[in-house]
Design a protein with these regions (language model features):
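Residue-level signature of mid-helix packing/kink "hotspots" within the transmembrane helices
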Residues: 34, 62-70, 122, 156-157
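Cytosolic juxtamembrane N-terminal segment immediately preceding the first transmembrane helix
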Residues: 1-34
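Extracytoplasmic gate region of multi-pass secondary transporters
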Residues: 36-40, 231-264
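Cytoplasmic helix-loop-helix junction between adjacent transmembrane helices
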Residues: 113-153
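C-terminal ends and interior cores of transmembrane alpha-helices
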Residues: 90-104
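Membrane-interface helix termini in secondary transporters
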Residues: 42, 73-74, 78, 165
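Helix-loop-helix hairpin linking two adjacent transmembrane segments in secondary transporters
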Residues: 148, 152-201
Length: 264
C-alpha cells in the first residue's frame, strides 16, 4: 500500500504520545520487578531467610507471570490494550505497595503478593504490542517496539541505582511504597492520553489519522492463520529458543546479582 505524507499536524504526533506512555509502563514494570532483588538483602537479614527461602520468594513472581502472559494477549485483543495494560499496572502497583505488609504477615502472604504482582506485569508486552499494531504504520513498528523495549534496561539500571539509596535512607519498605506509587501516577496520565485505536482518540489530527489508516493494514480485522501453521515454522522455534536462553540469563542475573555482589 502506498505511503501517504504525514507532514501535517506538527512534529509531535499522537502516536508518539502513545508509545511514550507504553515506554513509561515498561519502565515502571522493571523498576517494580527489580527492586526486590536489592531489598531482599536487608529483608533476609530481618526475617532470617536462608538462600532457599529467598529463591522461592524471588521465583514466585514468575508463577503469576507464567499463568497470565498468554492470556494477556487474548485479553488485549478482546478488550483493548489501554484497558488491559492500565489494569495490569494498577494490579502490580497495588501488590508492590502491599509487599512490606505481606512480608510481615508471613511467608504465605508474601508469596501471594509476589504471584499477584506477576499476574499484573504479565499483560505488559501483549498489551503494548496490541497497541503498536493499531497505532503504528508497518514501517514504524520496529522503531516503536525498540523504543518501548528500551524501558527494560533503563528501568533496570534506575532500580539498581536508586533502590539502595532508598533502602539506606528510608528503609527497605519504602522501596516498595515509592515505586508502587509511580504506577498510580502513570495510570492517571495513561487514562487521559491513550485510546485503544486512533479512531477513538479525540485529539488526533486528521492527517495523522489518514496516514495510519493507509499504512497500518494490520490494524484491521484479519483472520489469523491456524496455530499449527505457526508451530511448524522453524523460524518461530528459533526465536522461541533464543528468547528462552536470553531471558533465562537475564532474570537469573537480575534476581541474584545484587546479593552476589553484596555477599562477595
Amino acid at each position: 500500500m502506498a505511503e501517504l505524507s504525514d507532514s501535517n499536524g506538527g512534529f509531535w504526533k499522537t502516536r508518539y504520545s502513545v508509545i511514550l506512555m507504553c515506554f513509561a509502563a515498561t519502565f515502571v514494570c522493571y523498576i517494580d520487578r527489580v527492586n526486590i532483588s536489592v531489598a531482599i538483602i536487608p529483608m533476609a537479614e530481618e526475617f532470617q531467610w536462608d538462600l532457599e527461602t529467598q529463591g522461592i520468594i524471588l521465583s514466585s513472581f514468575y508463577v503469576g507471570y507464567l499463568i497470565m502472559q498468554v492470556m494477556g494477549g487474548f485479553l488485549a485483543d478482546r478488550f483493548g490494550g489501554k484497558i488491559v495494560l492500565g489494569l495490569g499496572v494498577l494490579i502490580w502497583s497495588f501488590f508492590t505497595v502491599v509487599t512490606p505488609w505481606a512480608a510481615f504477615s508471613g511467608m504465605i502472604g508474601l508469596l501471594a503478593a509476589r504471584i499477584g504482582m506477576g499476574l499484573g506485569e504479565a499483560v505488559t508486552f501483549p498489551s503494548v504490542y496490541s497497541l503498536i499494531t493499531r497505532w503504528f504504520p508497518v514501517h514504524e513498528k520496529a522503531k516503536a517496539v525498540a523504543f518501548n523495549a528500551s524501558g527494560i534496561p533503563i528501568g533496570t539500571v534506575f532500580a539498581l541505582v536508586v533502590t539502595p539509596i532508598i533502602v539506606s535512607e528510608l528503609g527497605w519498605e519504602w522501596a516498595f511504597y515509592l515505586f508502587g506509587l509511580v504506577g498510580v501516577v502513570w495510570y492517571a496520565a495513561w487514562h487521559l492520553v491513550v485510546t485503544n485505536t486512533p479512531e477513538e482518540h479525540p485529539r488526533i489530527a486528521a492527517a495523522e489519522m489518514r496516514y495510519i489508516a493507509a499504512n497500518a493494514p494490520a490494524a484491521g480485522t484479519v483472520e489469523a492463520p491456524p496455530m499449527r501453521q505457526f508451530l511448524r515454522n522453524k523460524a518461530l522455534w528459533a526465536i522461541i529458543v533464543a528468547h528462552f536462553c536470553n531471558n533465562w540469563t537475564l532474570y537469573v542475573i537480575l534476581s541474584w546479582l545484587p546479593k552476589y555482589v553484596n555477599d562477595g
